[in-house]
């Protein structure tokens, strides 16, 4: 192809997708320069050299994918789709409630790329802002529950309850213990997730009223709901004590708004508390994303699932925050991990923490009190109207069984309200009852409207209610109230004015490095552009305010959105069916393996329980296998980083009768397209197994090869990687699965929505379509890029990675290469020689990169002592060169150590990163200059990102674990570290 022809192709692509040139970083001329350096004449021939010929598709799939367009057209089309959602006032409850997101939090956090484009805070020195916000979140949860350890969020309440069940099961050492007792008042979606998670582990669920629980040595745990699904408040102390008497752990699923008023659940004896902070300022968004929480006793700190933020000290002795106790997590412990959770819901946890900062304890209590009093007034009105209402203590919800129910629902619908239909799952006209849940948005006028509806249905005059005055709240809730002051930490009192809160948010943003500052070249993470046009629609009321269990005729917009994405993802991957329910890659993995397991069981092959996993696999893979009830058998990799075919064949044959699946990542975790992927799939199929393809690296394949056509049976897709949902500092994510036709009947279902297959595995996530509220992001990306644009993006992602490998190879060995000496979309740089020659660890390079203004690549994975670099298609040639210049300059610094020019212990690498405070200190006792420390590149004198703290002492933080802000009393004790916030 001549240069003129290439320009014509580019012009055609730009015309068909005006957004394309905004998304792809290198210009056409830049791409030509990069290709020239790599020895290729055009992108087409370059891609043909990278992708194995037996899987390469020469044209983009187009049967269902649209042509690309500009952001204005895409947004207009999405506006029409959104308009098909009819937002009514939903008083359904069941874990999802109306809430008011403070405008400042919406504008400065949810819609702020400085917050939503950051990565999980593994590099803590440049992540102090969101670590502080998460520290506040953990403090909030710990104070709410009275439990000393709280994590930094989980995916949803159902998942959190399942993790509590798993922890209780793992802690119990009695071999006969296999029974988990569940409160009959638990939320239906939570019960569904529990059932899905319990069966593969051999756990027997028993659902009953807590007063009828049968305790014996076979019981390892209980789950109680407070308040219950019907709104009931009750004292769980007796049930918890009974559990403890047989050595079982007690988990209580709580409503955080109710917990604001009542005594902390720890005072009733709970070992674990779980729940969702959705009603703390996070929109319902048709089911998610929302941050769940998990709090427990200190003795279980090493079994807690998910991330845990702890306080330590830096090299200057100053307090600093970092992720604590990481050795319990999947990326280190693999199949021995406490959980497979990786991405959680950091952005939503941050929003909830700022909601608490915004309102403070008094503001939260005022909201909870208003909700409680409205419920009490409604109950009085129901009694006056003659409705049969049980006289029990409640918080926000009342359920009524009555013959007038169909008329109540009809009148409510005409007035613009959705009420809970009882029994759950039936049509309103067939209802035997109704439920009403008040929330933060409820008002006296809303109560009057509801009473008018109820009066009309009952044929009675509207009751006139006297003001309750100042009632004793303890009589209304039937439980001890919170007695001691809570949330007394300064952060929950200092920022009452919007001016002060705005400045606090801005101070925290300044302590975090995100994509607004520069490239984040994390391998296997795909930190690409999250365009503003893609993010704007998630705040539209039509998407943000819809209840996940609203009547189907109000949700046509979401139905269209889901349908489009399912069709497009099926086309892109070459599969027959898609489920959007998994709300993280880890949950996509679990869903995929459970689908495979269900298929085997449907064929009478229950003995198939072995999963082959390459030793290079991501830690979530083996951790997920264990959760799916499968046994992990490792498969070796050869010297080139590929799956060892001989070892695979040997293991597959040895375990043939028990072989359930192979989990394989493609391109491999070593960053190459393995040429024998078809042979691998055929080998596994030949022994009766299925092939699960981890889609973490799908960005290298779009438009050029499809897992469903080269042999995989199921694949999960990370929308927060390949399809532009931002990482949010550690979530939200979406991890749909795409499956072959024979697996479609087993796609996950849900008890309250029509989704999944006829023999579906059950709910993986609490909401039917998982984190539906952020699906518009991926819809916008796909709509604007179009089939050819997606193909172009993958080509440039491959080109950029190979350009980096080419430029850096003279300075750092590139560990693995595929055919023609090329890598895929990422490359691994070997830093191990520097340990031998200069005494440097990979962490020294990672921390020094901060001084150059970069987040480090993925460190020591999949090979210890290396970094894995993934530039994505969105970074410009200028930015790629800036990163290369930084890495080359660092190599020159290491050479100075090797030659003896600088001290091997006291040098810019071993002392990195360098803070503004350190560089401007009165005393400078280092053998290199302040300029060498802070401005290693001349351009940094014009624009410089400063690490907030010096290198953090991780070991100190784990030995002296502190996971929440100290109280005023604790701060008076000099043995407690001062919190980082001033």
UniProtKB/Swiss-Prot annotation:
<dbReference type="GO" id="GO:0005829">
    <property type="term" value="C:cytosol"/>
</dbReference>
<dbReference type="GO" id="GO:0004375">
    <property type="term" value="F:glycine dehydrogenase (decarboxylating) activity"/>
</dbReference>
<dbReference type="GO" id="GO:0005960">
    <property type="term" value="C:glycine cleavage complex"/>
</dbReference>
<dbReference type="Pfam" id="PF02347">
    <property type="entry name" value="GDC-P"/>
</dbReference>
<dbReference type="Pfam" id="PF21478">
    <property type="entry name" value="GcvP2_C"/>
</dbReference>
<keyword id="KW-0560">Oxidoreductase</keyword>
<dbReference type="GO" id="GO:0019464">
    <property type="term" value="P:glycine decarboxylation via glycine cleavage system"/>
</dbReference>
<dbReference type="InterPro" id="IPR003437">
    <property type="entry name" value="GcvP"/>
</dbReference>
<keyword id="KW-0663">Pyridoxal phosphate</keyword>
<comment type="similarity">
    <text>Belongs to the GcvP family.</text>
</comment>
<dbReference type="GO" id="GO:0030170">
    <property type="term" value="F:pyridoxal phosphate binding"/>
</dbReference>
<dbReference type="InterPro" id="IPR049315">
    <property type="entry name" value="GDC-P_N"/>
</dbReference>
<dbReference type="InterPro" id="IPR015424">
    <property type="entry name" value="PyrdxlP-dep_Trfase"/>
</dbReference>
<comment type="function">
    <text>The glycine cleavage system catalyzes the degradation of glycine. The P protein binds the alpha-amino group of glycine through its pyridoxal phosphate cofactor; CO(2) is released and the remaining methylamine moiety is then transferred to the lipoamide cofactor of the H protein.</text>
</comment>
<dbReference type="InterPro" id="IPR049316">
    <property type="entry name" value="GDC-P_C"/>
</dbReference>
<feature type="modified residue" description="N6-(pyridoxal phosphate)lysine">
    <location>
        <position position="721"/>
    </location>
</feature>
<dbReference type="InterPro" id="IPR015422">
    <property type="entry name" value="PyrdxlP-dep_Trfase_small"/>
</dbReference>
<comment type="subunit">
    <text>The glycine cleavage system is composed of four proteins: P, T, L and H.</text>
</comment>
<dbReference type="InterPro" id="IPR020581">
    <property type="entry name" value="GDC_P"/>
</dbReference>
<dbReference type="GO" id="GO:0016594">
    <property type="term" value="F:glycine binding"/>
</dbReference>
<protein>
    <recommendedName>
        <fullName>Glycine dehydrogenase (decarboxylating)</fullName>
        <ecNumber>1.4.4.2</ecNumber>
    </recommendedName>
</protein>
<dbReference type="InterPro" id="IPR015421">
    <property type="entry name" value="PyrdxlP-dep_Trfase_major"/>
</dbReference>
